[in-house]
Amino acid sequence: MSLNKDLTIIFVSFYSKNIIEKPINQIDKEIPIIVVENSLDKDLKDKLEEKYSNVKVLIPEKNTGNGGGINVGLKEVKSKFVLYLDVDVELNKSTIETLYNNAEKLDNFSILGPSIKNFPYKNEFYLDKNIIPGVHSMNFITGCALFFNMKALNSIGFFDEKIFLYYEENDIYLRSLKKDFKILLIEAAEINHLGNSSTDLIQRDDIEINRNWHLMWSTFYFHNKHFGIIKAYEKTIFKFLSSFIKFIFFSVVQNHLKRKIYYARMSGIFNAMIGKDSWFRSSIKNNIDN
């Protein structure tokens, strides 16, 4: 088996044209890369495909979120394995090879995850430590770097595109475990997740409002989908009441950002409760990186 033939890398980009080349340059030029550009920036497609012979940029018809963006890439691949990476992930020299080598020898897994520098996992995320030395069975791994076994993933199903943001990984992990596929943490494969934002303060405010809306919507949707309506209300009703109180308080003291954030949280929960789709979107325009 050949790593270059058996593996495809996927990035999902959203207004990342200032930083996308850095993660691409970490990848061996023989490994095919798919970039899904959720900002619908066709100029970026032309630029990257002209510069990198191993890069294909896909422009979806609309922004369906991170999980939906990954799905766009997954539907294009023909390889045995896929490595999804956030654009702000730094790889060690051996990270990809270590994940691939483990994938070739491990059985019955759906997803492998690397260890993350300065990010120890809580004990509650481990199902079985050291099933072989340095390999742990998990119920959750951070979604910034996911190594997919495509045969298993085709059995489980791809990401739930009703979820725009938050809980998309939890959903696919739970579906994976229900089908008895393992999620494995590979200690020897290490990454650094920078978690940096490339947007300015105003844009970060807009993104923060967007994130809060979707966190609340997805919390209700995920728990309703997998555990029923009562559990969904248990998880969100006090968050709704708390957000209402804070919305009133920050309206009185005229903290406009906090007021918008807590209104967004209430709106996200309310829309999920009444069965509306995850419709809220950031208002960032195409020229924010100019």
Which stretches of residues belong to each language-model region?
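Short, well-formed alpha-helical segments that are part of the catalytic scaffolds
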Residues: 11-29
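Short aromatic/hydrophobic "clamp" motif used to bind/position activated sugar donors
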Residues: 82
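Glycine-rich, basic loop-to-helix element that forms the pyrophosphate-binding segment
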Residues: 60-77
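A recurrent flexible, glycine/aromatic-enriched loop bordering the glycosyltransferase active site
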Residues: 131-148
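A conserved acidic beta->alpha catalytic loop
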Residues: 26, 37-46
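Non-catalytic, C-terminal membrane-associated alpha-helical segments of glycosyltransferases
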Residues: 210-218, 229-290
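Conserved donor NDP-sugar-binding/catalytic core segment of glycosyltransferases
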Residues: 93-124
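A short, conserved alpha-helix in the catalytic core of glycosyltransferases
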Residues: 145-148, 152-157, 162-190
